[in-house]
Amino acid sequence: MKGVITIKNNNDRHPLDKIEKWLVFTGYAAFVWSTLFGLIHIYWAAGGTLGFEGKTMGEVLFIINLVAIALCIISAFTALALVQAWGRRFPSWLLLTSAWGACVVLGLRGGVGIIQSLLESESLSLLLVIVEPFFLLGGILYGLLAFLYIYTSNNGKKIKQNGINMR
């Protein structure tokens, strides 16, 4: 027919398949983030001084590092559990609580840290350029991971959360 435009859809796959791929990618990215963050804290707990301008760590910072290492292990486990088949053994509310908790804590820490660094510093500092955005990235990854998990759960059925249809 003249004047009719047809749009050919080359994607025969279900749209949920793409979102599930994003879920898996985000889960592994969050796992890598937690692993890197944990390794940094292990280095500091073992006496490393990189980032401390040559100063040694006090007792309080040592304990903070130990707590951070434990939280990194939990968050890395959570990231994998949300995208691996073995993760179905755990209640989704437990995994989602962990993911949303990481999102809020890391997001707030990164966001507030960026604002604080901007207000206190006249020049670009290591905190502003690397540390604070790294916290923010972790918060974004865990928030996205939790959202995508909810979106793709129940075999793609429409999910309602707080009366809002998420699909």
Regions found by a protein language model. Give the residues of each.
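Cytosolic juxtamembrane helix and N-cap/initiation of the first transmembrane helix
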Residues: 2-37, 156, 167
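Core segments of alpha-helical transmembrane spans in multipass integral membrane proteins
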Residues: 38-40, 60-83, 100-104, 108, ...
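Cytosolic juxtamembrane helix at the C-terminal end of the final transmembrane segment
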Residues: 83-88, 145-166
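Juxtamembrane helix-break-helix junctions at the cytosolic face
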Residues: 16-19, 77-100, 153
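Membrane-helix boundary connector in multi-pass membrane proteins
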Residues: 113-127
